Amino acid sequence: MSCQQNQKQCQPPPKCPSPKCPPKNPVQCLPPASSGCAPSSGGCGPSSEGGCFLNHHRRHHRCRRQRSNSCDRGSGQQGGGSGCCHGSGGCC
């Protein structure tokens, strides 16, 4: 009986961190997207190594092309809202 009660108390804890993980992901991605570039442009940020969160499939093509062109200049948002970079901090 002592063992069964111990196992029951061990099961609830692992279920707690699970729901706390999903909400933390979007929260960390929201700030960089708003700070790095406009959310209407596609939402890019350093948090997402892929470049953009919203248009991940379509923007992924442009992100790689403007990566060294717009980000390498040190201007960050020189792409004009057409490309994202994951090396300089996320530019749109």
Curated annotation (Swiss-Prot):
GO biological process: keratinization
Keyword Protein biosynthesis belongs to the record: no
Signal peptide: none
Key words, A-Z: Keratinization
Annotated Low complexity bias: 1-10
Coiled coil: none
Pfam families per UniProt: LCE
Reported tissue expression: Skin-specific. Expression was readily detected in adult trunk skin, adult arm skin, fetal skin, penal skin, vulva, esophagus and tongue. Not expressed in the cervix, rectum, lung, colon, or placenta.
Biased composition annotated in UniProt, kind: Pro residues: 11-22
Induction comment: By UVB.
InterPro entries found in the cross-reference section: LCE
Gly residues bias locations: 76-92
Region described as Disordered: 1-22, 64-92
Function: Precursors of the cornified envelope of the stratum corneum.
Subunit structure, as described in the record: Interacts with CYSRT1.
Misc. comment: Belongs to the LCE cluster present on 1q21.
Protein name, UniProt field: Late cornified envelope protein 3E
Organism the protein comes from: Homo sapiens
Gene expressing this chain: LCE3E
